[in-house]
Design a protein with these regions (language model features):
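Conserved catalytic or regulatory cores that recognize and/or transform ribose-phosphate-containing ligands
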Residues: 1-151
Length: 151
């Protein structure tokens, strides 16, 4: 019996996207380990962090260097680094796009999933291995992967 590790997906998206954990569950059913724990603080986590740091008198630059900013960043980065695959679930903000770009720069398999055609188009999503517009398309792309091709 072989003990192959499951490929790891880092699911990227917005804290405000209530569909994140459901997509994560669907991906788990396909046999992947999916990291979406970043979603657990809730939709206002960034705003609460900002308010807290403002009360302390911190600038944005200082807040990035304080314990909360550093620990949250290191937590996410650790899991991004251990993942083989990145999936950006749209709509997503600046952080999500930075995370996807970082993963693409590491030559990991990366995908963008839209739930509908966007109003504003952008050619740069072509950096991803595929741009999908529904779960079926994403599932087809993921089925093409072989464990030996994942970094």
């Amino acid at each position: 019996m072989t003990n192959k590790k499951k490929p790891v997906i880092y699911l990227i998206g917005s804290l405000r996207n209530e569909k994140i954990p459901y997509l994560a569950n669907d991906l788990r059913k396909l046999g992947f380990e999916v990291f979406d724990d970043w979603f657990s603080p809730g939709p206002e986590a960034d705003e609460f962090w900002r308010k807290y740091e403002k009360i302390r008198g911190s600038t944005y630059k200082q807040a990035l260097s304080n314990y909360a900013g550093k620990h949250i960043y290191e937590f996410d980065k650790f899991h991004i680094n251990r993942a083989n695959i990145g999936i950006l679930y749209m709509p997503a903000g600046k952080s999500g796009h930075l995370e996807l770009g970082y993963m693409i720069g590491q030559r990991k398999k990366c995908y963008v999933l839209f739930d509908k055609e966007p109003e504003r188009w952008d050619v740069m999503y072509q950096f991803a291995d595929a741009v999908c517009f529904n779960f079926k398309e994403l599932k087809e792309e993921l089925s093409k992967l072989k464990n030996d091709t994942l970094k």
